[in-house]
Swiss-Prot record:
GO terms for biological process: regulation of DNA-templated transcription. Keywords: Cytoplasm, DNA-binding, Transcription, Transcription regulation. Pfam families: TACO1_YebC_N, Transcrip_reg. This is Probable transcriptional regulatory protein YebC.
Length: 246
């Protein structure tokens, strides 16, 4: 998730879940294989692969494992016959939710996603029901840094926006295809980001209260536990006050 003040509780909760290293690695490897199969094995010429490589390295995947996954995709590995599927729906409190999946069996995947929604008070929607609320962006995050220096370097490199939060954290937003190029330019200027990811950024937010927040988090947990689910995006916002009660 992009940002800190807006998304900190979600990001930190997800980071704790990512301790399930085996499942996370399996999902990243699946994305590496698929991205390489569809767009070739050169990350500099394949934005989707570059984003997957960045995510793999951020999760401490070894270069050897990463390169083997790319080689499988380029070589047309029989296990790489996956397709990207996007599901949309509404969760507790009217939250808009997008689920990005990689699957070789649509029927299995939609059944798992629908089950999660039904268990948590949400509804799986039709194509386009919430997609218009989100924009696909690259998000390069700094936990701290000099705002003017980062902003100047980022905008010069082609970034679309730079946002500074109350806690001093800074997010650089880019066209998703340009994220790798902008990140490289920032690093060349001596500015090493703490994370970089492709995300779906919502244009509106849905405030969660003490009743709806835990239901939303449970839904996200259930969706992320589905083997075919790669990413879950939502526009729910949980205030610090509500988060403290969870």
């Amino acid at each position: 998730m992009a940002g800190h003040s807006k998304w900190a509780n979600t990001r930190h909760r997800k980071a704790a879940q990512d301790a399930k290293r085996g499942k996370i690695f399996t999902k990243i490897i699946r994305e590496l294989v698929t991205a390489a199969k569809l767009g070739g094995g050169d990350p500099d010429a394949n934005p989707r692969l570059r984003a997957a490589v960045d995510k793999a390295l951020a999760n401490n995947m070894t270069r050897d494992t990463l390169n083997r996954a790319i080689a499988r995709g380029v070589g047309g590995d029989e296990d790489s016959n996956m397709e990207t599927i996007i599901y949309e729906g509404y969760g507790p409190g009217g939250t808009a939710i997008m689920i990005e999946c990689l699957s070789d069996n649509r029927n299995r995947t939609v059944a798992e996603v629908r089950h999660a929604f039904s268990k948590c008070g949400g509804n799986l929607g039709t194509d386009g029901s919430v997609a218009y609320l989100f924009s696909k962006k690259g998000v390069i995050s700094f936990e701290k840094g000099d705002e003017d220096t980062i902003m100047e370097a980022a905008l010069e490199a082609g970034a679309e926006d730079v946002v500074t939060y109350d806690d001093g954290a800074i997010d650089v937003y880019t066209a998703w295809e340009e994220m790798g190029k902008v990140r490289d330019a920032l690093e060349a200027a001596g500015l090493k980001a703490d994370s970089a990811e492709v995300s779906m950024i919502p244009s509106t937010k849905a405030d969660m209260d003490a009743e709806t927040a835990p239901k939303l988090l449970r839904l996200i947990d259930m969706l992320e536990d589905c083997d075919d689910v790669q990413e879950v995006y939502h526009n729910g916002e949980i205030s610090d006050e509500v988060a403290a009660t969870l």
